[in-house]
Design a protein with these regions (language model features):
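Bacterial Sec-dependent N-terminal signal peptides
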Residues: 1-25
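Contiguous, structured surface segment used for ligand recognition
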Residues: 22-178
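The substrate-binding groove and active-site-proximal loops of carbohydrate-active enzymes
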Residues: 128-131, 192-195, 199-220, 237-246, ...
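An acidic-aromatic substrate-binding cleft motif
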Residues: 153-210, 216, 222-242, 432-435, ...
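C-terminal non-catalytic alpha-helical accessory regions
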Residues: 159, 163-164, 511-660, 745
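Gly/Pro-rich turn-and-neighbor structural signature
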Residues: 167, 243-244, 250-261, 288-431, ...
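Structured mid-domain segments that build the active-site/substrate or prosthetic-cofactor binding neighborhood
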Residues: 232, 237-240, 246-247, 403-407, ...
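Extracytoplasmic
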Residues: 666-883
C-alpha cells in the first residue's frame, strides 16, 4: 500500500493507538457503521505478506487462504500489492510491518519486546495482523480464521466451517496479549494400538521420502504437521512427541525441521534427557550397554552429546536429569516403575553428578553457558522423593512438578512438612520458573486409563487453578494419550494456560464449555450439548471404565441401578440431540459426544448385567440367564459402537478406538476385550420362593453445597464448584493460597432423640499433601462440642497411595470420625473447620447405625426448610436430567 494514503486517514490512525482490547469478536457478518468489508460476492482477496517473513507465518497464511475459501467462497492469494485487503507480518522479519510502525500507523509499543503477541487492527479499508514474533503472527492469523468460523478442531474433529457470504471487520485494535504460561503443550503418549494404527494407515511412510520406513510407521512430518497446526490454532507452542515405539528426531529428520519452521518448541518426556528419545537407546541397547550412569557414563555422555548437537539450533526445551531404563525408577527394570527401592544418599550424589555433567555437555555443544539454554527437570514419581530430601538444580533450570497420574497435584512450590498459613509467590520465585505435568491418560497401576475421557471438567479446572495460584506458570503440559478422544480437555487446558486469570471464578469453566459447544455444534444447540459434555465427564470421573467391576457400586440398595439409569438417560438425550442437529454437525457430534456417551452407557449396562447375573445365580433366580443374555448383547454392542466410530467421515478415524478396555485383571491392558464371565442356571437349579426383603435407615447424607451456614476467612471465601465430584458439586475455600483461620461451614440435620453417638463421614477430593507433606487437616465437631482434628491425607505417600483408599484414581478420600457429645435435641449441627488450604468438600454422611458403604455415599436425604411457605424444597436435591 502507499504509506501516504494510510497516513492521511487520521481518524483510523488515532483509533489504533487506543489501548488494545482483548481479542473479543472483531469480525461481523453484517455491515455496521465503521466496519471494513473483507470478503463479499465471491471476490478474490489478496493478502500482502513479505516473502522473507518466518516460514511458519507463510504456512499459516496459506492455511488462512484455504479457510477463507471454505467460509466465504472467496479465493485468496499471496501478493505484494500495497492495496491488499489484508496485511500480515512479524515485527522482527517484515519490512512492511516495520514501515507501518515507523510511520506510527501501528503502535510499536504493543509489540516490541513482547512474546507471542499479536495485534489485529483496521486502517482505512484494510485489516492488519502484526505479530511480535513468528508465533505471535501465527496466532493472529489463526484468530482471524477462528472468528471467521473455522474451529481449531475443524480437521481433528470434523467441526464444520460456518458459511458466510459477507464478512466485515470492526474498527479498532484487538489482541489477546501475551501468554501467561510460557510453554503450553501436550504429550502424545501410550499411543499403541490406537494412534499408532491410525497414523500407519493415514500417513504411510511411502508418501514421506524423508521418513525411515522401517522405523517411523506413520509418525513422520506429514502427521506431525497436522498436530503442529492444531497446537498453533489453540495458541499452544510445546510438544512431547509419541515415543513408545518411535524416535521423533531419528525416524524422520524432517520432523524437527518442520516443528521449528512452524514454531513448535519440542521437548522430551521425564525419562528422555538431553533431547534423545528412549527408542534411540533401546534399539541399540545391546551395543550401548546398561542405562546406568554409575557404570556406563562414557557411552551415555556420548549419547547426550549427540542429542544436544542435533537440537542446538532449534528452540527445544532440554530435559535434564535421568530416570531408569524405559520409564522405570533409577536401578529398576525396564518399564517397572513400581519396583522402586530407595538408596537416598547414593542416588542424590549420582543425580548431582548427572546435572553437572549434562550442563557441561550443553555448554560444550552450544558454545554458550548452560544457563543460556532453557532446561527442564521433571519431579516425576520417585524423583519427588529426592527433591523432598533436598536435591536441587541450578536456579535457571525450570522445575516441572507433576500430578499423581490421576489428576491430583502432588506438590507445589514452597511445600514443607508443616505447610504454610498463606502463600507468598515471592518466596518461591526462581529464574527457571515452575511447571506442571498433568494427565488425562495414564498407563500404570492400579489400571491403565487409555480408552475414554474420564477427567471431570470441574476437576481439571480446580487442579490447574491450584497450580497457577501457587506460582506454577512457566510450563503446563498435558498427557493426552492418543489425542482423541481428549479434544475437550486439551482445549480447556490450553485455554487456561494462555490466561488463567480469565478462569478465576468457579463457574468460568462452564462458560468455556458453552463456548466450545457453540463453536462445534452451533449456537442453537450449545446449551444442550454443553450439558451433555458436562454430565458425561462428571459421570465418567466416578470410576474409570478399566476399573469398573460388579462390586464398584452398591447393588443391593439400588445405587448401581441409579448410575446405570443416569447413563441411559444421558444416552437418550444424546441420541435425541444427534437426530435434531444439522447434518453437517453430526460427524463432530458423533466423535465429541455421541460415542463417548453411548460407549460408556453400554459399558455400565454390561457390568451391571454381570453383577445381576452373579447375584441371581448365587440366589438361584431364573433371571440369571436373562442377565447373561444382556452381557452377550452389550459385549457385542461395544464392538458395534467402535465400528461406528471408525466409519465416521468415510473411515477417517479408523483404529482410533482400537483400545481394549473390557476384561482387565491386572494394571496392564488385556490383549483383546474379554467378555465378562457369567453363569447360567439349569431348570433344576432355579430356586422356588423363600426370598426376604428389608429396608434400612439410619443415616443422613448431605451434599456439601447444602450447608446451613458458613463463615469465610479474612482473605478466602467458600465457593461452590458445580458438577465437581461424584454426584452434585463441592465447596472449597478459595483462593487456596490464603490463610484458613476463621473459616468454617455448618451442616444442620435431624436425628432420633435416642441417638447417643454418630460416625461422621467427611468425603473430600483426593487432594494429596502437596503443601503440608505431613498431611492436610480439618477439625470436626457436633453441637458445639470439642473439635476433633483429622489428618485426611497424611498417609497418601508414593509408597502406599493405592493402599490408603480404594484407588487414588477414584479421586475420593473418606474419613470417619466418631462423635458422642450430642445435644439432647432433635436438630443437630456438624461444624467442619479447615486447618490447611486445599480442602475440597464433596459430601457428608452422618451415620447413626444404618449406613452401609456406597460408592456415591447415599442418595441425599430429604431437605427440610425452616420456612416452607417461603421456599418449598423439592424432595430430590439434584434432578440432574432436568438441569
Amino acid at each position: 500500500m502507499k504509506m501516504h494514503k494510510l497516513a492521511c486517514i487520521v481518524v483510523c490512525i488515532l483509533t489504533t493507538f487506543l489501548s488494545a482490547k482483548a481479542a473479543d469478536q472483531f469480525i461481523s457478518f453484517s455491515k455496521q457503521e465503521g466496519t471494513v468489508a473483507l470478503f463479499q460476492n465471491n471476490k478474490a482477496v489478496e493478502i500482502k505478506v513479505d516473502q522473507n517473513d518466518h516460514p511458519g507465518v507463510l504456512r499459516a497464511v496459506k492455511s488462512l487462504i484455504a479457510d477463507i475459501k471454505e467460509v466465504t467462497g472467496c479465493s485468496g492469494q499471496i501478493g505484494q500489492n500495497e492495496n491488499a485487503r489484508i496485511i500480515i507480518g512479524s515485527l522482527d522479519k517484515s519490512s512492511t510491518i516495520q514501515q507501518l510502525a515507523k510511520k506510527k500507523i501501528i503502535d510499536i509499543k504493543e509489540l516490541k519486546g513482547k512474546t507471542e503477541k499479536f495485534i489485529i487492527t483496521t486502517v482505512g479499508d484494510q485489516l492488519i495482523i502484526a505479530g511480535s514474533d513468528k508465533r505471535g503472527t501465527t496466532y493472529g492469523i489463526y484468530e482471524l480464521s477462528r472468528q471467521l468460523g473455522i474451529s481449531p478442531w475443524h480437521w481433528w474433529a470434523d467441526v464444520p466451517a460456518v458459511k458466510h457470504n459477507e464478512v466485515y471487520a470492526l474498527s479498532g485494535t484487538y489482541t489477546d496479549g501475551e501468554p501467561v504460561v510460557r510453554y503450553r503443550g501436550i504429550f502424545l503418549n501410550d499411543e499403541a494400538p490406537c494412534l499408532s494404527g491410525w497414523v500407519a494407515e493415514k500417513f504411510p511412510d511411502s508418501e514421506c521420502p524423508s521418513a525411515n520406513p522401517n522405523l517411523a510407521h506413520g509418525f513422520n512430518h506429514n502427521f506431525y504437521e497436522k498436530v503442529f497446526e492444531l497446537l498453533l490454532r489453540l495458541k499452544a507452542n510445546y510438544l512431547w512427541p509419541a515415543m513408545w515405539g518411535n524416535a521423533f528426531y531419528a525416524d524422520d529428520p524432517m520432523n524437527s525441521v518442520v516443528a521449528d519452521e512452524m514454531g513448535i518448541i519440542m521437548g522430551t518426556s521425564h525419562h528422555e534427557p538431553m533431547a534423545r528419545n528412549h527408542q534411540e537407546w533401546a534399539r541399540h541397547r545391546e551395543e550401548n550397554g546398561a542405562w546406568d550412569y554409575a557404570t556406563n557414563q562414557k557411552v551415555i555422555d556420548d549419547f547426550f552429546h549427540e542429542g544436544i548437537r542435533r537440537a542446538k539450533n532449534n528452540e527445544d526445551l532440554i530435559t535434564i536429569g535421568m530416570r531408569g531404563d524405559g520409564d522405570a525408577a533409577m536401578g529398576g527394570k525396564e518399564g517397572h516403575d513400581d519396583e522402586f527401592v530407595s538408596q537416598d544418599d547414593y542416588y542424590i550424589k549420582l543425580y548431582e553428578k548427572i546435572f553437572k555433567n549434562q550442563r557441561q555437555i550443553i555448554k560444550e555443544e552450544t558454545g554458550k553457558p548452560a544457563e543460556k539454554r532453557p532446561q527442564m527437570w521433571a519431579i516425576y514419581k520417585e524423583v519427588q522423593h529426592y527433591y523432598d530430601l533436598g536435591l536441587k538444580v541450578p536456579e535457571d533450570v525450570l522445575i516441572m512438578l507433576c500430578d499423581d497420574n490421576w489428576g491430583n497435584i502432588r506438590r507445589v512450590p514452597g511445600a514443607s512438612p508443616e505447610g504454610m498459613a498463606s502463600f507468598d509467590k515471592k518466596l518461591v520465585e526462581r529464574k527457571g520458573g515452575w511447571g506442571m505435568y498433568y494427565h488425562v491418560d495414564y498407563v500404570g497401576a492400579p489400571r491403565n486409563s487409555k480408552w475414554a475421557n474420564v477427567t471431570p471438567i470441574a476437576h481439571l479446572w480446580e487442579q490447574m487453578m491450584l497450580s497457577y495460584r501457587y506460582g506454577i506458570d512457566r510450563l503446563w503440559i498435558l498427557n493426552v494419550g492418543d489425542l482423541k478422544p481428549m479434544e475437550y480437555p486439551i482445549d480447556l487446558f490450553l485455554s487456561m494456560a494462555w490466561n488463567p486469570e480469565q478462569f478465576a471464578s468457579s463457574d468460568s469453566f462452564r462458560e468455556h464449555t458453552l463456548a466450545f459447544c457453540e463453536s462445534a455444534f452451533g449456537k442453537d444447540h450449545s446449551k444442550q450439548t454443553a450439558r451433555l459434555m458436562e454430565l458425561y465427564s462428571t459421570y465418567n470421573g466416578r470410576v474409570t471404565p478399566e476399573m469398573l467391576n460388579p462390586r464398584t457400586y452398591n447393588l443391593a440398595n439400588g445405587e448401581f441401578l441409579q448410575v446405570v439409569n443416569e447413563y441411559k438417560a444421558l444416552e437418550a438425550d444424546a441420541i435425541r440431540e444427534y437426530n435434531s442437529i444439522g447434518a453437517e454437525y453430526r460427524d463432530a457430534f458423533h466423535q465429541l459426544l455421541l460415542f463417548p456417551i453411548q460407549s460408556m452407557a453400554n459399558m455400565y449396562e454390561l457390568i451391571y448385567a454381570q453383577a445381576m447375573n452373579q447375584f441371581c445365580y448365587i440366589n438361584g433366580m431364573a433371571e440369571a440367564n436373562e442377565w447373561a443374555d444382556v452381557v452377550d448383547v452389550c459385549f457385542d454392542r461395544d464392538q458395534q459402537l467402535t465400528d461406528g466410530y471408525h466409519s465416521i467421515n468415510g473411515g477417517k478415524w479408523n483404529h482410533l478406538m482400537d483400545q481394549t478396555h473390557i476384561g482387565y485383571f491386572m494394571w496392564q491392558q488385556p490383549p483383546t476385550n474379554i467378555k465378562p464371565q457369567t453363569n447360567r442356571l439349569t431348570a433344576d437349579q432355579i430356586r422356588d420362593g423363600g426370598f426376604i426383603l428389608s429396608s434400612k435407615v439410619g443415616y443422613v447424607s448431605i451434599e456439601a453445597e447444602h450447608y446451613y451456614s458458613k463463615t469465610n476467612a479474612k482473605d478466602a471465601q467458600w465457593n461452590v464448584i458445580p458438577t465437581y465430584g461424584r454426584t452434585k458439586s463441592a465447596v472449597a475455600l478459595m483462593p487456596y493460597t490464603a490463610a484458613t483461620e476463621g473459616a468454617s461451614v455448618n451442616y444442620k440435620f435431624e436425628l432420633p432423640k435416642d441417638v447417643k453417638s454418630v460416625k461422621v463421614h467427611v468425603i473430600t477430593n483426593s487432594t494429596l499433601p502437596y503443601l503440608r507433606a505431613n498431611g492436610h487437616r480439618y477439625a470436626v465437631s457436633i453441637d458445639g462440642g470439642t473439635p476433633v482434628e483429622v489428618n485426611y491425607n497424611g498417609d497418601c505417600t508414593e509408597e502406599n497411595t493405592y493402599h490408603t483408599f480404594d484407588v487414588v484414581a477414584t479421586r475420593i478420600i473418606e474419613t470417619i470420625t466418631e462423635l458422642s457429645s450430642i445435644a439432647n435435641t432433635e436438630t443437630h449441627t456438624v461444624t467442619i473447620t479447615p486447618i490447611d488450604g486445599g480442602m475440597v468438600l464433596e459430601k457428608i454422611v452422618i451415620d447413626y447405625g444404618g449406613y452401609e458403604k456406597q460408592h456415591l455415599f447415599g442418595t441425599e436425604s430429604s431437605l427440610k426448610n425452616e420456612n416452607p411457605n417461603e421456599w418449598p424444597m423439592p424432595q430430590r436435591a439434584f434432578p440432574r436430567r432436568n438441569q
